[in-house]
Amino acid sequence: MKVLMFGWEFPPKIYGGLAVASYGITKGLSLQGDMETTFCLPKPCGDEEKFLNIIGMNQVPIVWRDVDYDYLKSRLSTSTPEQYYAFRDHIYSDFSYMHVNDLGCMEFAGGYPGNLHDEINNFSIIAGVVARQQEFDIIHAHDWLTYPAGVHAKLVSGKPLCIHVHATDFDRSRGKVNPTVYAMEKNGMDHADCIMCVSELTRQTVIHQYHQDPRKCFAMHNAVYPLSQDLLDIPRPDHSKEKVVTFLGRITMQKGPEYFVEAAALVLKRTRNIRFVMAGSGDMLDAMINLAAERGIADRFHFPGFQRGRQVYEAYKNSDVFVMPSVSEPFGIAPLEAMQCGTPSIISKQSGCGEILDKVIKTDYWDINAMADAIYSICTNPSLFQYL
């Protein structure tokens, strides 16, 4: 079976959990033997693994240009002249009014720029060229950013569309939904033949908030791959005198970072032998630094910034407790990664991963007293640490 997949992130360029999930799914499909995946990205870096076919949408022409073969070889970093010409033969409309480069291709910033909605629209236009040129059996679109591309590919090809709901705007916004994003999400769901949700929690949101037929909505939980030996060999420091409690993720409203800081303040009223780490970046970072200072715990708080690759697992190994106090977490793969590293986890009851995890402590995200009790208990009770 051939899958035409649309995604917005892919390792080694990681902006969040979407890249990790996209990698895991495509890697798993590649091991099936009878699956061939073509993954469309706005702007590949060229260092992606080669177990799947990657199409850089920034190197697919939408305006016809008479370009020399040798010039193409020098200009195309992640594609070939042959592929360029094949796509050029399937340009389906006059897009000369669009802003394109000398190859007739659209440029993408990559990631999540200020003109994100423009890039989503451009991505879907290019998807029309790709869907006309490629041979495939099914379309798979990851998250709202690529739903328009998936819908366009379905309308062009008539092939079934599976959308993968990693999160909804209800999760990201605490209910203050962006109507434009909601409309894109609902349009993708309405056109989808199958809706894959990362948890039953998310499935219920899709059914009730987006008014979808339960018969086409399925909960498909995320998972993690076994760690490589070099990551398993990362040593755990001796924290017999001073424990380390870590929050690792985007420092945004959805992730509940303020509840972590407030719980830390309660714990530090009982003992000063614990350090707290808030690793990540986001629009609430400065506010959390200020909140830690206001609570008088800045000397016990560390903000190391965004962690990549091996740094993530070093952070887990360096922790005695991992805390994920998300307000609304469709799944949340970080606790699974922490547990792989032998680090006990505390998660909010509003997290989808709680549906499959037993040996974790679960509290309501807003219950900072329960969260503080759990942190203190794990840090002071070696038996509980070993059990978890």
Q: Residues of each region from the PLM?
A:
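Conserved donor-binding/catalytic core segment of Leloir-type glycosyltransferases
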Residues: M196, D238-A264
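Conserved acidic donor-binding segment of nucleotide-sugar-dependent glycosyltransferases
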Residues: V360-N369, S377-P382
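Short hydrophobic beta-strand element within catalytic cores of glycosyltransferases
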Residues: P344-I347
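A conserved catalytic-core segment of Leloir-type glycosyltransferases
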Residues: M35-A131
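Nucleotide-activated donor-binding/catalytic signature segment of Leloir-type glycosyltransferases, i.e.
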Residues: A287-Q307
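Aromatic "clamp/platform" in nucleotide-sugar-dependent glycosyltransferases that forms part
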Residues: V327
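Carbohydrate-associated surface elements
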Residues: L201, A223
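Short alpha-helical donor nucleotide-sugar binding micro-motif in glycosyltransferases
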Residues: F306-Q307, E314-S319
